[in-house]
Amino acid sequence: LSGAALFLAAGYLYAYDYRRSGNLIHLRGLFSCFWVGGQGAACLKLSKLQTDWALQTWICFFLALVGFWITFEVLDRLMGGNERFTMNRYRQRSTVRPLFFCIVGLTVISAAAFVTEAAVLGFIPVLVRGVPHAYSAFHMTGLHYVTVSCVLIPAMTVLYFEQGGSRSGRKNGLIVLCALVSIAIPILCVSRFQLVFAVILAVFTFCASQKNVSPWLFVVAVVALIPCYVLLTVARSHDVTYLNGIFEMKNAATPIFITQPYMYIANNYDNFDCLVRELPAHSMGLKGMFPLWALSGLKFIKPALVDWPIYVN
């Protein structure tokens, strides 16, 4: 019941901002939809591992939404209600030429990082069979951040062609090739998140550059991603019995395309509840800065930055 109520609330909050702005990717509308909708999904309690959240957890979730909602409203009014991003303003600050070099350069760097990881580690995840955690093992400290930076290229490609592209067919063809390489890398890494992020970011960029975009574009993108998501899950040597067993799903026959995303979403909220109950003190944001400590190498210089207890729920 609580899950259904939160789904309705998420839909209403998104529709409220969409009707007012006419913007499919209205920032507050999207945040409200995914934040509250994610809680609704977690409240379905499809797994035996899930428990009721503490009152403090509910208060934190509510304050996060209210704080974002009010802050956005205040800033939106101060800025004249012009939340919509338009490409006209962007075109005044940029040209096709620098975008071309950025796309090609980032593709080369990302591909080189991927090849380096594959050479040093001795395998490519998508080619490995029977090893469910091949993706987790395909990781070199610091370098992997460079490898996955390819997820920015599809969105940059959208910007490139939105500005007219190049008069040279070869240059345009090279950009398309770069976009294909950027999609291929997450597939070779069997990284579902990176693939989904790359596609969704490109779709959002396209929507931001157009005045009128059909909501069906999002539906088509999601439908197109589902088979890719399932295939990558299979390539990871994850079958539905394995996943439903690990996540202790109440219904052992739950389809894999429901189990996988559901647990990713639900676990975020359940993990937060676990930390609310177990953490003796607030980390003051230090845990959230782990990517900085890893990329900069500071975690090796000062291990205390990442020396936090691991809680299992």
Can you say where each PLM-predicted feature lies in the sequence?
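Membrane-anchoring hydrophobic segments
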Residues: 1-177, 212-215
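Membrane-water interface signatures at transmembrane helix termini and the short loops
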Residues: 39-51, 189-193, 197, 302-313
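Hydrophobic alpha-helical segments of polytopic membrane proteins
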Residues: 61, 167-252
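Short, highly charged low-complexity linear segments
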Residues: 68-78, 212-219, 238-244, 286-296
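Hydrophobic alpha-helical membrane-insertion segments
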Residues: 102-114, 224-230, 293, 297
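Small-residue-enriched transmembrane helix-hairpin modules in multi-pass membrane proteins
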Residues: 130-139, 228-313
